[in-house]
UniProtKB/Swiss-Prot annotation:
Name used for this protein in its record: Prolyl 3-hydroxylase OGFOD1
Annotated binding of 2-oxoglutarate, by residue: 169, 230
Reaction(s) the record says it catalyses: [ribosomal protein uS12]-L-proline + 2-oxoglutarate + O2 = [ribosomal protein uS12]-(3S)-3-hydroxy-L-proline + succinate + CO2
Compartments it resides in: Cytoplasm; Nucleus
Positions contributing to Fe cation binding: 155, 157, 218
SMART domains assigned to the protein according to its UniProt record, in alphabetical order: P4Hc (SM00702)
One example of a Gene Ontology biological process annotation: regulation of translational termination
Fe2OG dioxygenase domain residues: 134-239
Family listed: Belongs to the TPA1 family.
EC number of this enzyme: 1.14.11.-
Cofactor names: Fe(2+); L-ascorbate
GO CC terms of this entry: cytoplasm; cytoplasmic stress granule; nucleus
GO MF, any single term: L-ascorbic acid binding
Length: 542
């Protein structure tokens, strides 16, 4: 149906011929009264409902699929053309990589205007009727374009006022082999995402919508096609916010002081260049200038070769680390490690290594380390730490093991009510340097994310990489450091064989490992038996 857009009063276009207003309707089958009542009843009872015009499912959370959402193919083609003519901007951070248009709220293109009217007037009214949610007229929609290696990782969409999320797909013929599926996650007893239990394949003119809630965890899987683009319009209908369950805090990973170990272990393992005191002084000078350094060929060649051989033999028992809204990678089970790998872990926990790192960085990681300016620095850090810990009950404090304060499972840190300031100060003064570490396996699909509860503190990060010959930055897998509240990277640490990366971070710095995409499979051309790379990851605390 077509009509004319009336000229605005006072406009110089008045009296002149103007473009016809584009009109479109969504599926009559959805608005048919009997069907509408059935859908509303299914929503109310939280029971599945299937019809050729709409499918509603409750597993793992309430979501609906409407095929043939728009009646006119001509309208859809016109809409697609307008969308592809928009300016797209790359969206890139720890959570996603894709291209997005500007907000479509004020676009004047006729087909975009018509779709906006359909969605935020007629369709919003229909959803309000079936869901009994008082949805607002707030317009919140944009266009997204996912191409090869683009993805949006696990998240729940929860933001103040978002009640219903929707996606309208305008894709060429598509199947699961192309990636780009909308993956839905189940949750565990703590309302944390557990695993993918359903994947919806994009389809031309299909609209998916779901209820935004504390359990609506989903992702857009990586697009695997190098020829096709996944084009969609997505947004949210806003309304009264739901009450969130209490924030879940993960159990803290215990930190441990150094293991008593003779300094001879350093001569057995480490490149002699790095044991020269004059060279250590140069390293410290550079580190104190930039708070980071990369020490190449760190381990002796024979030892490094033994470590790599043990990793490539595949005799390590790995366990997956989650939940997927925070991280996804594999961690070695230390009790089952081959001797050479167990010895390497012991090296990084050794007293000799704590002292060596003190010499590299100037940090007080050993009682023998120089501490000329300790009083000012230590008091400042302790003061900040104390202030942060008193705010834990009201702020988004961390459930991230790497970024949490407790050094051990000291029950007094979790006791209720105020504590004795003098007792607290005594504990701080008597505290000893500690560390925590793991051996990790990184391969296609792995990542870590910054999350709402990320908490930071002063710490020294150590990374030693293995098996990453020929690894390219475009594959992902690099460690990125950013300032709180910012997307701009402060530092990127790329995987480099037998290189030791040291990074000192403060309370305003967050880190993540970028999602490893399918470009990384290029590695198999040179190393057919290798999947990804490994790193020894340790964090040291003064």
């Amino acid at each position: 149906m077509n009509g004319k857009r009336p000229a605005e009063p006072g406009s110089d276009r008045a009296g002149k011929k103007v473009k016809k207003e584009v009109m479109a309707k969504f599926s009559d089958a959805v608005t048919e009264e009997t069907l509408k009542k059935q859908v509303a009843e299914a929503w109310s009872r939280r029971t599945p409902f299937r019809h050729e015009a709409i499918v509603m499912d409750m597993d793992p959370f309430l979501h609906c699929v409407i095929p043939n959402f728009i009646q006119s193919q001509n309208f859809l083609e016109g809409l697609q053309k307008e969308l592809l003519n928009l300016d797209f901007h790359e969206k890139y951070n720890d959570l996603y990589k894709f291209q997005q248009s500007d907000d479509l709220k004020k676009r004047r293109e006729p087909h975009i205007c018509a779709l906006r009217k359909i969605l935020f007037e007629h369709f919003r009214s229909w959803i309000s009727d079936i869901s009994k949610i008082d949805l607002e007229s707030t317009i919140d929609m944009s266009c997204a374009k996912y191409e090869f290696s683009d993805a949006l990782l696990c998240h729940d969409d929860e933001l103040e006022g978002r009640r219903i999320a929707f996606i309208l797909y305008l894709v060429p013929p598509w199947d699961a082999s192309l990636g780009g599926t909308l993956d839905l996650f189940s949750v565990d007893e703590h309302f944390q995402p557990k695993q993918i239990v359903k994947s919806l394949i994009p389809s031309w003119n299909t609209l998916v919508f779901f209820e935004v809630s504390p359990v609506s965890f989903h992702q857009v899987s990586e697009v695997l096609s190098e020829e096709k683009s996944r084009l969609s319009i997505s947004g949210w209908f806003h309304g009264p916010s739901l009450t969130r369950p209490p924030t879940y805090f993960e159990p803290l990973i215990a930190r441990s002081p150094h293991i008593p170990q003779d300094h001879e272990i350093l001569y057995d393992w480490i490149n002699p260049t790095y044991l020269d005191m004059e060279y250590q002084a140069q390293i410290q000078e550079e580190f104190e200038e930039s708070s980071e350094i990369l020490l190449k060929e760190f381990l002796q060649p024979e030892k490094f070769a033994e470590v790599c051989e043990a990793l490539e033999r595949g005799r390590v028992e790995w366990s997956s680390r989650g939940p997927p809204n925070k991280r996804f990678y594999e961690k070695a089970e230390e009790s089952q490690l081959p001797d050479i790998l167990r010895d390497c872990m012991a090296l990084f926990r050794s007293e000799a290594m704590f002292l060596l790192l003190s010499n590299f960085t100037g940090l007080k990681l050993h009682f023998l380390a120089p501490s000329e300016d300790e009083p000012e620095d230590k008091k400042e850090r302790d003061a900040v730490s104390a202030a942060e810990n008193t705010e834990e009950g009201t702020s988004h404090s961390s459930s991230e093991p790497e970024n949490s304060w407790a050094a051990t499972s000291d029950s007094s840190l979790q006791s209720e009510g105020p504590t004795d300031p003098e007792e607290d100060e005594a504990k701080k003064e008597s505290s000893v340097p500690t560390c925590q570490g793991e051996l990790r396996h990184w391969k296609t699909g792995h990542y870590t994310l910054i999350h709402d509860n990320s908490k930071t503190e002063f710490a020294l990060d150590l990374l030693l990489y293995c098996g990453c010959e020929g690894w390219e930055p475009e594959y992902g897998g690099f460690t990125s450091y950013i300032a709180k509240g910012e997307d701009e990277e402060l530092l990127t640490v790329n995987p480099e064989n037998n290189s030791l990366a040291l990074v000192y971070r403060d309370r305003e710095t967050l880190k993540f490992v970028k999602h490893i995409n399918h470009r990384s499979l290029e590695q198999k051309k040179s190393f057919p038996n290798r999947t990804g790379f490994w790193d020894f990851s340790f964090v040291y605390y003064e």
